Amino acid sequence: MLQCLFFVMDPVFLSEITVELVKHSASDSDVVFSARVSTLGSFVAVTDCLSNRDIGLITFLMRERHGSPFEHSHMTFRISAPIFVFREFMRHRIASYNEESGRYKNLDPVFYIPDEKRKLVQIGAPGAYKFEEGTSEQYGLLIEEMKELSLAAYDTYKRLLACGIAREVARMILPLNLYSTMYVTINARSLMNFLSVRTSRANSAFHSYPQREIELCADRIEEIWKGLMPETHAAFEKQGRVAP
């Protein structure tokens, strides 16, 4: 019964996705020495200074899709996003995930609402559709309904907990726009696979049409990764954003 005493936050509505790099072992040199062990054995020198030959090797590996050398770079991200984004993210069974638990802690009343840049109207059939701007009336209705339902659901959640109902049962009432937090650990090869389908770029060999919210998440991750492994990222771009 004490769990009902731990609600200290007022409800918050946000329109952003946050991504933070927690730790990493990721550099372009990881790719180089991992690949060269194939021909040089234990005589591979590990260095962060890349030669033109090293950069050429990275490009070759990407172009010919020799992927395993890209698996030796790892990154751990802390991500805060609405639950529906995580459900899409975790379809990529190529990373390690640990998420905030609604069984073991009271969930905070932080909810996602789209900003005014979010296109609202779907035109066309599944697999061949596009999104267009909605009207101000549609946007106003959406935000009003989302806020009202989010607050009502959270009030019910608190009442259920106050009556002694277990967290893992009470959480069933909460909506998908509730924010959660997770840690994701992923290697560079798997990350490129994720980016190839969760971002939309004109230079992609295979065009993808991700939901806007997970693309916002992917964009932030890619910007961090680009800073860690710029030559690998450049090769990824050059080869049409196809994961090796």
From Swiss-Prot:
Methyltransferase as a keyword of this entry, yes or no, is yes
Q: Which InterPro entries did the record assign? A: Thymidylate_synthase_ThyX, Thymidylate_synthase_ThyX_sf
Q: Which residue range or ranges hold the ThyX domain?
A: 17-239
* GO terms of molecular function: flavin adenine dinucleotide binding; NADPH binding; thymidylate synthase (FAD) activity; thymidylate synthase activity
Q: Name one GO biological process term.
A: methylation
Q: Decide whether keyword Cell membrane is in the record.
A: no
Kindly report, in one word, the top-level EC class recorded for this enzyme.
transferase
Q: Which reaction does it catalyse?
A: dUMP + (6R)-5,10-methylene-5,6,7,8-tetrahydrofolate + NADPH + H(+) = dTMP + (6S)-5,6,7,8-tetrahydrofolate + NADP(+)
One Pfam entry name: Thy1
The record's EC number reads 2.1.1.148
* Pathway the protein takes part in: Pyrimidine metabolism; dTTP biosynthesis
- The UniProt record gives the binding positions of dUMP as E88, F89, M90, R91, E99, E100, S101, G102, R103, R171, R198
- PANTHER family according to UniProt: FLAVIN-DEPENDENT THYMIDYLATE SYNTHASE (PTHR34934:SF1)
Q: What does this protein do?
A: Catalyzes the reductive methylation of 2'-deoxyuridine-5'-monophosphate (dUMP) to 2'-deoxythymidine-5'-monophosphate (dTMP) while utilizing 5,10-methylenetetrahydrofolate (mTHF) as the methyl donor, and NADPH and FADH(2) as the reductant.
Subunit annotation? Homotetramer.
Q: Mind telling me which HAMAP family this protein's record contains?
A: ThyX
Q: What is this protein called?
A: Flavin-dependent thymidylate synthase
Source species of the chain:
Tropheryma whipplei (strain Twist) (Whipple's bacillus)
Quote the gene name from the UniProt entry: thyX
